[in-house]
Every structure is written in C-alpha cells, then in structure tokens.
Amino acid sequence: MANPETTTAQPNERYAWYVLTVLVIVYMLNFIDRQILSILAEDIKRDLHLGDADLGFLYGTAFGVFYALFGIPLGRLADNWHRVRLITIGLAVWSAMTTLSGFSRTGGQLAAARIGVGVGEATASPSAYSLLSDWFPREKRATALAIYSSGLYLGGGLSLFIGGAIVQKWNQAFPGGGPLGLVGWQAAFLAVGLPGLLLALWVSTLREPLRGQSDGIITPPLPNPFRGFVEELFTVIPPLTLIGAARRGVVPLAINLLFGALVVGGAWAMASITGDKAQWAAIGLGAYAVFSWASALKTRDRPTFQLIWGSPTFLLVVVGYGLIAFTAYAVSFWSLPYVERVFHASKATAGLIIGGSGAAGGFLGVIIGGRLADHLRKTNPAGRLIVALMGAILPAALLAISFTTANLTLYYALQLPMTALSSLALGASAATTQDLVLPRMRGAATATFFIGTTLIGLALGPYMAGRVSAWSGSLSTGVLSLLLVAPISIICLLIAYRTLPRAEASLLERARVAGEPI
C-alpha cells in the first residue's frame, strides 16, 4: 500500500490555491468558535455571575494555555504524520466542544469546554503552516501564510455578526428561554459549533504533499510517526514530565523539579495578589510545560532545539510578535463589551459594525502585510521584520483615541484602520520563523511561534485588561494599560532585524553542527 505521504509527488499551483482556500475556511471557523465569546460576554457575565477577570480567563487563559500546551506534541505530530488527517480530527474535536459550550450552566463547565476547544484547535495551524510551506515556494510563502492568517480576522468578524444576530433573535423569540431552557448565548454556541462537523468531512478529501517538496529537501516519512508524539507528551503534560525528566537522568529531574517549584511559588504569589487562582495556576502550568519541553528537546533533538530555542533571532521574533498579540487579543475581545457598557449600543448593531470592520481591516492588513513583506525580502533578508515593526508601532495612537473618545461614530470608524495596522505583522512574523528552520522542523517551529501568541498574547492580554478594569472600575483604563508593553515589542523586533541576515545565512551550518544529517 502506498504511504499517504507519497501519494502526491509534485507541486501543483492550482491545487495549492485550492488547498489554501479550504484552509482559510477552516481557520475562519477556528476563530468563529474562539472569538464568539466576545459578543456573548455581557450575557454570560450576567447569567453565570462572573467578573471581568473571569471573562478574560475564559476567553484567553482557559483556551490559550491548553492550545499552546497541546500545540507542542501536536506540532511534532504534524512534522511526522499525515497533516490532513490531523486537521480533520482536530476540527471535529473543537467543533464538538464548541457545541458543548452551549449546554454550560456554570463558569467551570464553560471553562472545561473552552479547554477542549483549545486542544482541538491546536492541531490546525502547525499542520496548515507545514502544508502551505510544502505547497508554496519560499518566494510566495509569506503571501500564502498571510492569506491563511486572514481567516483569523474574517472568522473573528463573522463571529461577532453571527453571535449578535442569533442572541438578539433568539431572546426575542424565547424571552424566557427556548428549547431545553437554552438562552441566546447558548444557542449561538450551538449554531457555530455544529457546522464544523460537516466541514471536517470536506477537509478530509485534501491531498497530502511530499514533505519538503517546495524547498527541494524531500523528507521521507517516519516508520513510526506517533512515537515522537508520545515522547512529546512525556515532555509537556504533568506529571508525565517528571517521568520524562527522570529518563534523562538525575540532574535533568532535579532541574525540572526546581523550576516547577519556582513556578508554583510564582503562581501562588500572583494568585495571592489578584485572587485569581485558576488564572495563575493555568499560566504556571503553561510555563512549566514549555520549560519541560524545551529541556527535553535539547537532549532528544538537538538540531531542532538549536534552530528554535538556541536561536536568539527566532526567540526575539516570537516574543516581539507575542507582545503585539498581547494587546491585539485584548482589544479584539473587549471591544464589544466596551461599546455595550459605555455607549449602550445594541448587540446586533455593534456586532455587525465591529465584526465587519474587524474582518475587512484584518483581511486587508494581513494581505497587504504579507505582500509587502515578500516584496521587501527580495532586496533585504530582514525586510519582513520592517512590516512586523509597522504592526507594533502604527496602531497605538488609534487605540488610544478609540478607548478615550465619547463619540460612538468615531469609535466605529477607527476599528477598520486600527485592525488593519495591527494585523500587518502576522504574516511577516510567521514566515520569518518558518525560514529559520528546516522543513522537518516547521510544525515544531509553528507550535513555538504560537506559544508566544497564546501564552504571552491570548492567555495574558485579555485577562490583564479585565483585571485592571476590575481594579480601576474602568474598562478603558484596562485596555489602555496594555500599551505599556509596546516598547518591549519594538526593541525585540529591532534586535531581530539586525541579527536575522546572519541567522538565515548560517542555518544549514548550525543544523549540521548540531548533528542534522544534511
């Protein structure tokens, strides 16, 4: 029987664009299911008796930590197994968990469902980035990844429009609760979750390309692709991490335990200060898991470790973009609750305008950013990071105006340009990390990139805005306080800009020195 990885032999440009189209739709649904919580937040807060910090936890941390944590072993599986099958399974899982969100009666139940959504969605981008990197040549890669990333904004925008419309119509039709006692926000979860199960059938029909074909470095399939996945579980999931560390020796186990103790102490201190035990327990779990994984990777796969964790340039890009995401995710989540509270806007109208502006602005931003990044790279190896820097600098003034104006029309008008500018950096940053590793490492590189966007951005940004809002009594203050991280992001990206040409030029040599047989 032919191995599924060898059933497609040569790149096909038309089919590559077809695959990209399907993956954009998948990513749109990914963000519909992820982002719809924003338009439902005020209703959930009222019905489940939650606070702003709780909402930030549900949207960001409960989802984001487990998305990042499971993204590591699933990224490894994407490097070794049939990527189309992996996306198909993940899509079915996260759609089912979104559907279950609609039956939640407590904050704890909703948090558990959000964790499940995070685990399922962790399959998507490592597999998609790897697939697209094999279907598209290097000179078109940032454009392809930017188009794929547009699904983030299209899906996020659609979620607000769909969610607002469903909640309003459902509550009008069933003011005391509908079938099974479901209220509007619960019906919205069901409406966006169930279609994903059908989409999974379509995704399963995609062909699997030869790994490394677009770079001329064909990587043969592994005879036992799940071995690496299981190994990663022992490096990421506590308490399996202790077994994994013990297998490497007494010293690695001692270091792992010491770091774990430091994390527990730090999480306890932050929980004592804020009162948010679940938030900091989850952040501590994520930090410990990432440390355990990186430590094991250094022993087990030194070439991959050296090109990812041993590369200052790679890490600077991850942190730099992660801090952009820190603010962007918070703005994305809190914009709808903000206009409902401050301007008393209707849910359906706000969802339509902010959702439409976010979708259009995000789509334009990632497409223009990707094309501009590819263009600048032709004459400057670090040219893509100029675009990333634009995404870190340009939106700040518009954000400050948006969350201080007393004019609702101006607030709405600023949403499109603000989203467009903040989305410039995504395709450029993602493509930069893909270029800094070998083809077989792309899934792991993508998982690492998303550690920054999730543990730094998603798991902390919305929560911190909510926590500052709760402390200050002002959601505007909560969101604006996040601008304090912008200078750190800019510094990281500027240093990466200076070091990137040397890092790319030395890629193969560093891999050989680390033991890669090339």
Question: Residue locations for each model-derived region?
Answer:
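Helix-breaking motifs and short loop linkers at transmembrane-helix boundaries and internal kinks
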Residues: 49, 82, 103-109, 120, ...
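Conserved MFS/SLC helix-loop-helix module at the cytosolic interface between two early adjacent transmembrane helices
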Residues: 69-108
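Central cavity-lining transmembrane alpha-helices of secondary-active solute carriers
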Residues: 58-76, 129, 356-369
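Cytoplasmic membrane-interface "Motif A"-like loop-to-helix N-cap segments
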Residues: 80-91, 374-391
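Helix-loop-helix hairpin linking two adjacent transmembrane segments in secondary transporters
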Residues: 148, 152-211, 244-284
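Extracellular/periplasmic helix-loop-helix junction of adjacent transmembrane segments
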Residues: 38-69
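C-terminal transmembrane helical hairpin of 12-TM major facilitator-type secondary transporters
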Residues: 381-429
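Extracytoplasmic gate region of multi-pass secondary transporters
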Residues: 37-38, 248-282, 312-359, 366, ...
